[in-house]
């Protein structure tokens, strides 16, 4: 075979086990439905051990794209960190030990900041609790937590449970919760610096709602219809109303999120550059991150460093002299570039990246179409030229709108993708392209919890794999995301390298 291939990723389009709670099943998707009757298809595992995550852990876009591009199971930092937590060896990690020594010697405060939930997508509360226990063993006198509440990878009001658990653990280990801010502000990844500024000023200047009872303030927030993701900064005070802690020059700050993309902006504001419009100034801190957020960051220490993956699909295609396009809107652009390339920023020879801006709306239920039509309109002319050999295309809608939990909007998002996918596939088939249509994980397939409340998190459901080809209709095996790159190489007639341990699906 010597085909040209488009990998079309319908982000968050899982296979529902209960159609009643699925926006995909509720949506009118004549095109994707027609593919199931005409073309070979199978199911892929996109969560848990099959993608290098702990058993039962839902997949996510970062992990999904890494496995897709690598053509193998990529053992995630989460698994490595979990091992250190369960074996109680976090304190032996050299960068963490050095930071604790510095804090002790210099009498500096240690501030932990990150997402406090068991969602396991960006962070895990058990990691934080283990860090706090490790800090206690190191006899650090001043330890504070700046908690970001979740409500996106977990239920919208589960923050109360997690924060109660955290406060109890702090009481045991001598630490204190200093501030609480919703992830919408603290973990932006779309250059909404006005959001990031709220989190920055909460931690650095103790700006926010002052309270002697953080848990009660979270309850008050719920009563005002503000759920975890959107909680405005809450500042913990002592009995006299004085804030317990502010991040100050020379302090140790540890961002314990292990996923990289949503820790970058707050790290930039605290350590890399001044944002005068938002009155954010970088501080001289002893700053650590759980994993490497950005190779370009200066003076940021990394607790769990990872190496670039060799021989990803992009590198193999470069070696074969093939041209490739990576195309997505802002929200998923790092996924089709950095993560699909195994943690590499630099494009390969013959690689063109096409970016379209995600709409500037507060939440994507307000514009469920997002920028899917822009991607369609950008890619079709490229396919008509017949020059590019491989395309990695991501439609973000089912995932990004799925995270809002607004069912009718998610239905609209799914229908938008069905229409745009149809236009791209028809154009591609007319110009000799084959398509592998998949999802990287589920989301829109489970929109309602058993108690009737909206589900805003990813699912652990299987995802579809459809091979759309004008001529060849081989039987497709079921598999995992790490089998897709070998399948693409087989279609393209390019030899699979030994580093790719996944197997072609036909």
Regions found by a protein language model. Give the residues of each.
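Feature captures the catalytic ectodomains and active-site-proximal regions of enzymes
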Residues: 1-506
């Amino acid at each position: 075979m010597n085909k040209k291939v488009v990998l079309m990723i319908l982000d968050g389009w899982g296979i529902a086990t209960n159609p009643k709670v699925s926006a995909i099943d509720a949506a009118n998707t004549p095109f994707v439905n027609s593919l199931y009757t005409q073309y070979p298809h199978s199911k892929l595992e996109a969560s848990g051990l099959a993608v290098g995550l702990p058993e039962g852990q839902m997949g996510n876009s970062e992990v999904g794209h890494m496995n897709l591009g690598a053509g193998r199971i990529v053992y995630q930092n989460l698994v490595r960190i979990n091992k250190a937590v369960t074996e109680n060896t976090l304190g032996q990690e050299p960068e963490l030990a050095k930071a604790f020594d510095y804090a002790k010697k210099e009498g500096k405060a240690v501030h932990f900041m990150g997402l406090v939930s068991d969602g396991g997508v960006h962070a895990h509360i058990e990691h934080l609790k283990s860090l706090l226990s490790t800090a206690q063993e190191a006899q650090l006198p001043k330890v504070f937590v700046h908690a970001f509440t979740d409500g996106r990878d977990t239920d919208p009001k589960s923050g109360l449970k997690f924060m109660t658990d955290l406060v109890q653990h702090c009481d045991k280990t001598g630490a204190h919760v200093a501030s609480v801010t919703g992830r919408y502000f603290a973990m932006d990844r779309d250059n909404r610096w006005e959001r990031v500024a709220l989190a920055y000023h909460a931690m650095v200047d103790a700006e926010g709602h002052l309270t002697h009872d953080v848990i009660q303030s979270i309850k008050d927030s719920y009563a005002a219809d503000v759920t975890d993701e959107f909680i405005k900064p809450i500042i913990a005070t002592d009995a006299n109303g004085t804030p317990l802690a502010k991040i100050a020059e020379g302090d140790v700050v540890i961002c314990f999120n292990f996923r990289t993309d949503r820790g970058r902006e707050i790290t930039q504001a605290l350590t890399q550059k001044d944002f005068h419009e938002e009155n954010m100034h970088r501080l001289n801190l002893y700053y650590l991150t759980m994993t490497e957020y950005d190779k370009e960051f200066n003076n940021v220490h990394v607790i769990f460093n990872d190496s670039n993956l060799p021989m990803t699909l992009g590198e193999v295609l470069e070696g074969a002299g093939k041209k490739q396009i990576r195309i997505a809107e802002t929200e998923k652009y790092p996924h089709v570039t950095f993560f699909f390339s195994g943690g590499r920023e630099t494009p390969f020879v013959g690689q063109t990246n096409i970016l379209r801006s995600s709409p500037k709306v507060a939440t994507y239920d307000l514009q469920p179409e997002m920028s899917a039509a822009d991607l369609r309109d950008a890619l079709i002319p490229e396919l008509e030229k017949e020059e590019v050999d491989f395309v990695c295309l991501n439609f973000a809608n089912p995932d990004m709108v799925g995270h809002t939990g607004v069912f009718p909007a998610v239905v609209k998002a799914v229908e938008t993708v069905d229409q745009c996918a149809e236009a791209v596939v028809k154009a591609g088939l007319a110009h000799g392209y084959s398509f592998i249509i998949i999802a990287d994980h589920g989301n829109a397939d489970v929109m309602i919890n058993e108690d009737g409340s909206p589900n805003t998190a990813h699912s652990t459901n299987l995802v579809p794999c459809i091979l759309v080809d004008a001529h060849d209709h081989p039987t497709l095996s079921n598999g995992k995301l790490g089998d897709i790159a070998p399948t693409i190489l087989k279609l393209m007639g390019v030899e699979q390298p030994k580093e790719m341990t996944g197997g072609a699906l036909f």
